Structure formats: C-alpha cells, structure tokens
Amino acid sequence: MEIINSLLDKIYDSTFPETCRARLSDAIRETRDALTHPRKAHWDEKDVVLITYADQFRESEAPTLRTFSRFYQQHLQSSFSLVHLLPFFPYSSDDGFSVIDYHHVSAICGDWSDVAELHQHTRLMFDFVCNHISSHSAWFKHYLAMDPGWDDFFISMPPATDLSGVTRPRTSPLLTPFEMADGDTRFIWTTFSADQIDLNFANPFVLLSMVDVLLDYLAKGADYIRLDAVGYMWKTPGTSCIHLEKTHQLVKLFRAIADEVAPGTVIITETNVPHKDNISYLGNGRDEAQMVYNFSLPPLVLHAIHYGSARALKQWAASLGVGSGTTTFFNFLASHDGIGLNPLRGILPETEIVSLVRDLAAEGALISWKNNPDGTASPYEINVTYMDALNKKEDDDDTRLQRFMLAHALLLAFPGVPAVYVQSILGSRNDMEGVKVAGHNRAINREKYAISEIEAALSDRKSLRHRVYHALSALIQLRIRQPAFHPDNPMEVLESDNALLVLSRPVKKHDALLCIYNLSGREMTYSLPENQRYRNINNDERVEGDVPVRLAPWGWLWLKR
C-alpha cells in the first residue's frame, strides 16, 4: 500500500481525505483476500488475442455470450489464448463505450455467470472505460437532480471559458448544455460526444467509485485491463488536457492497485496518439502500463502495401528497440475503431498521409475528422475493414487474400503480443448498410451476425470467409510454435531493397528466424547470407543460402536457420 498511498498524495497534493484513504484500503484488501483466480505470470509467443464484441453472434433468444463461447470453443480456441471482450455493459451509444452501468452485464449478452463460463476456456481482457460515463447513467442523473454528494462528479464550465488549447479528438462541442433540477443550465465537459460525460477525477469520491469498478473487474477475473481513452482523464483548463502528469499518476495508481490485488494482471493503455506520446505510458518499465497499443503499425503496414514500399515501415521498425522484459507492445492491424492517422504524424509527412486518405476514400473508405486548435480540421481516422483497406474494388479474391495474409504475417512477426479483430479472422468486407443504419462511420467495421450465417460461410470452401479463416488460423498456429516470436526477443531490421522488409528474430546466438516480406506487386529476390542453410517453416522445405530466394508479388517467407 505504500506505493498506492504515495500516488494518492501526488495526485491530490496531499489533500486526499483520510476517510477515503481508509475506504480505499479496505476495498483493496477485501478484493485481494477473496481472489482465487491466479494470473499468468508473463507473456510468451503462445499469446495471441482475439478482439470481439460480446454480442458479435446471435442465435435465437440465447444470450450472445453463450453463443460466442460455443463458437470460440469450436473455431477459435486453438488460435487465440485470450479474448478481448469489448464493453459488454448496458450502454446508450458508441457501441458500448458510453456505459450506463459499469457493474452489470448487458441483458442481451447474458450475465456475469456467462462471462465466468467463457473464462473457463480462455483468459479475458475487459474494457475499463475510465474517462467518461453515459448521460443516461444513474451517476449523471444524480448530478442533474442536484442530489447531495454528486455536485463535483462531473466538470461544468462557463461557456465563455477559453478552452481553445484543449486537444480535441472529435469535431463535436467540448461543452454540452444540460438543464439542472433548479432550472439552470450547466455546460458540461464532453470530450467525445454529448452522451459521453467526462468524469471529474479531481473529486476523491469519483476516484473511489472508479477504483470500485476496477476492483470489480479484477474480482470477476479480468486478466488484462484496457484503459479506454485514458489520455484525457485529468483536466486543467489552460493546458492541452491530454497526457497531463496527473493522468500518468492515475494510470500508475491503477497499475499499483492491480499489482496489489491480482499480480500478473496486465494494464494496457489506449492512447491513439503520436508514437512518442503513446509509449510514454510505459513509464519507467515497472510503474505504469505493461503494454501500449502499437498504433503506428496498422497505418504503416497499410501504407507499405498500398505503395509497394517498405521504406517508412523499415525506418520506423528499426527505431522500436528491444523490449524491456517488463513492457511490450500490443500489436494489431484492425480493431472496432478505424485506422488511426495521428500515430503516423511525425513518421510520414502530412502530404503522404493526405494522399493515402484520398486513395482509400476513392475506394470506398470513410474518413473521420478532428478539430485543431487553429480552427482547421484534419483527418484522424480511416474507417474501413482491413481487408478492403488493402485492396481495390476490382481486385479478385486471390489478390485480396494474398495481400491480407502478407499483412498478418507481418503482424505476427513483430515483437509484442499480437491481436486480431474478429472481422479480420472472418474475412469481412465493408458494411455500408450498417453505416446507413447506425449513422456513423465506424459501423463500417462493426457488423454483427446471425451465427448460422457465419457458420454457413465458413463451411463454403469457395467463400472468401472460408479461405481467410483457414489461412489465418493456420498461420497463427504456426506462429505460436516458434520461440523466436516471444514478445521479449529482439528484432533486427536487415538491409534490403525498399520493396522488401527483412526481419531477424534471434532465439540464441547462432539461431534466428528470418522473416522476408515483398510489399510490392512484382516478383522480387533476396540474397541470403552465404554458407547458411534454412528451413522454410511454412512448407518444411530446405533453402540453401547461396541461391537468392524468390518472392512472388506480396509474398513472404519465414526461414529458420
């Protein structure tokens, strides 16, 4: 508790009430003493994460978590050792990220017993939506009713307050008017939408309430805790209100509580920002998040395949450095959100980012924008399935599959823990009808299915879904058998033509896995080190080092020395 108490003093400038401190200490101790589920001590090459909604599949009147559990056991368990269940709580908007009640499971998904049943078959990652809560929540209703004890739970500002320096991830107003019980209007801080009300962590009782949520998730067995939109948690008018020091201290506090209650729990921060700011949430390697999303990877892989050049990807990959052993990257290509562009800024010139946006928009992708402090707007996200991002409308399925598998062979070779979005393992295309129905761009990559529809598609040998599912499942299962892909193993980027990316993942001093990728649409060759023999682990064929290897368009090889 010493670390926890020290952080409380830093966050609240030594004014944290002793009654709150005692309550917090009691809650931590009670949760720790009641916990029976041990966490995995450390990550390894066998860890691959599936990202999915809890209501991804429907089956008559059955709770969707039960349907998912059956599908997972039949089709996914051999590939994925951990499931990230996107928010499965009652919500009012944003497909789960405007939570009405943190402590209950949405009725359509089931209840906590269904979560526990799934947990018998896989480790689980929960979302801790810690920056904001739904305007339909009991907490906000108490606030609007002006009930005693709720006055400072949220942040109100005079509408004339100069907040021009605040970093904005959206084009919606930062302050939203709400009528209070006495008839007055207050303008409330809403970073993401009028329905998502920012919590006021400067109020110690807000912290206590949110720590209760964290402890509940730990008690329910969460192995990974994802801190959603965490960069915006602490607000100080006159600043950018992102990545503030007290925000980092809050993350450190959540980490310290998880370490105290359930050692081995992984804290992962979701900060879709430039790379330098993103990795700042790893702290000193032992005191903040254990993982950060590798947000630069999805747009850089897309950029490389789109233009047939690994130049930018190669330079960035060479700068990643060696993992500390106590922190690592959460690598992914697609998720429930779009492909973020902010993580490209500082890596690619703005002209190249805009060019990529225009090219993909011409092929049917949707673009989301953010407001800048100078009054301009910039593209911040490309909304598209990763399958359609990589390909043109007129491409055939053979080409689609080739590019898609190239991208995922890259994903699975990078240092870190890889994660695959459910729409990717299912080979999904853009859901334009879903966008019309939902009225927002992100619905393009969030389609939900009748379980019978998906199982029929996976049984159809000619369907793209069948081909993607079997090819990607086989690739993941090959990956988890390679000790070279342990997240903590170093990676070396080797010299090559800019159309190629060549990575070496050493296991021992004279043993390495060589990963060679052709990002272009033309055949390429690569000269291996002479006097070396390799084995192609994809087909078990021997490869002699004195003969250049040929790579088909968008082809790749994993060679074991």
Task: Give the role of each language-model region.
Residues M1-Q532, N538-R561:
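Active-site and adjacent substrate-binding regions of carbohydrate-active enzymes
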